[in-house]
Amino acid sequence: MNSFFKSLRSSSSRELDHPRVTTTLSKQGADIVVHNPSANHNNKEVLQRAMDSSKGKILMNNTGTSSLGTYESDQISESESYDLSARMIVDTNHHISSWKNDLFVGNGDKAATKIIKIHPTWDSRKQYMMISRIVIWICPTIADPDGKLAVALIDPNKSVNARTVLKGQGSIKDPICFVFYLNWSIPKVNNTSENCVQLHLLCDQVYKKDVSFASVMYSWTKEFCDSPRADLDKSCMIIPINRAIRAKSQAFIEACKLIIPKGNSEKQIRRQLAELSANLEKSVEEEENVTDNKIEISFDNEI
């Protein structure tokens, strides 16, 4: 008997937290309107609670009635004080990809080319994905490089003359970083090896064919969403990297890797922050205990 009353209390509390709302349709002229009558609760608060229990960030917008599409040539709209974007949750789980390592190889006296397909794993049930940022870092691996470099973001589905979406130019004399900011999302059906966006690299460095003259590392940020997104701007930022900047110890490198924690649980992030702190302390100790072991080279005893 006690268990019976407990179940009644638990069910009533669930109804208070997530009350049922009856949705009705009515036709007003050529339009079909969706009515969500308010019960003894606030619709926005219910929606907010439902979103707060999900992972990801919430995009709220209170601009008024939203178009839901058409049904049998009639326009369907929703008579709510919030629009569809209020229901869109951007899933940021595992959204930063790991660094991919590749090589840029020579082509003899001809310009060297390389194509990288940006084809992320679709590890979400949501129907749209936005690759909001692509970072590509190119570092020369030979002495005295002098090649000019061009990196272009290509949409292979456009006409030949319109395929270049963004482009940046520089030199491989020093390490260089290109950051592409994208402003559109793609449906799941388009995320294929044939249809995905590509990075095209072109360098006029003269080097033996099929022998590497530079290292290419790249990564991207992806965000999944239920509705398609279209941001305002797209751009390419070029960042030359000073040769004097280098990691002095393995501990420092490990600390840098942990600056952006992976995962969402508190336990995961706390563990990674503890490792970050430990590696930074170890790096400082190593730097303080460094002895000068440089080998002196001279031409006094030439043979």
From Swiss-Prot:
Residues 1-11 have a biased composition (Low complexity). GO terms for biological process: transport of virus in host, cell to cell. Signal peptide: none annotated. The keyword Transport applies. It is found in: Host cell junction, Host plasmodesma. Belongs to the tospovirus movement protein family. Viral movemement protein which is responsible for cell-to cell spread of viral genome. Increases the size exclusion limit (SEL) of plasmodesmata by forming tubules structures, thereby allowing viral ribonucleocapsids to spread directly to neighboring cells. This is Movement protein. The lineage of its organism: Viruses, Riboviria, Orthornavirae, Negarnaviricota, Polyploviricotina.
